[in-house]
A protein has these predicted regions:
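Nucleotide-activated sugar donor-binding and catalytic core shared by glycosyltransferases
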Residues: 1-168
Length: 168
């Protein structure tokens, strides 16, 4: 459960406790990344800072969010943009969205990428917590469809969409 959910359970005489998040343990096991080696292996420019793009892990979510995130590239030409790709989605899927944009695709290297990123654009979800635990400044993004938004607005009573704001 999340910290703010405890009163809900108490109302129904359920003894519930927030015990933390398993990511906290996972992050303590991370090994530092050798910047020079990582940049060379992944053909990244050592002279440019990295902005990580984490558009989500589900096909529909990535389709909806990545296009919006890519619009920032033209605003910050002095940075290099790197997408942390979901291993469950094929490279061709990302390439069909990215087109000719000057952006790099990385699979299975999200934590290493975040360790070297100066900032990140992150779709709301677990990735926001991972990004925060690695001390990377982030902009949290989400775009739902209009019907879902209006239903959620009536039902959900939290101020934030970001796990970082809900947990930390």
């Amino acid at each position: 459960i999340l910290p703010f959910e405890k009163p809900f359970y108490e109302e129904y005489n359920v003894d519930a406790h927030y015990v933390g998040h398993p990511l906290l343990d996972e992050m303590t096991k991370l090994k530092p990344v050798n910047r020079k080696v990582f940049l060379k292996q992944n053909k990244l420019d050592p002279k440019k800072e990295i902005i990580a793009l984490l558009p989500g892990s589900r096909k529909q979510e990535v389709s909806r969010m990545l296009d919006i995130m890519l619009k920032t590239i033209k605003l910050y030409p002095d940075y290099q943009f790197v997408i942390a790709c979901a291993p469950s989605l094929p490279e061709e899927f990302y390439k069909s969205i990215v087109g000719e944009e000057n952006v790099h695709l990385l699979f299975n290297k999200t934590y290493q990428l975040l360790q070297l990123a100066s900032a990140a654009l992150v779709t709301s979800g677990t990735a926001t917590l991972e990004t925060a635990l690695l001390y990377v400044p982030e902009v949290v993004c989400y775009k739902g469809n209009a019907i879902s938004y209006h239903i959620a607005k009536k039902l959900i009573k939290v101020k934030y969409i970001c796990l970082v704001n809900l947990i930390m």
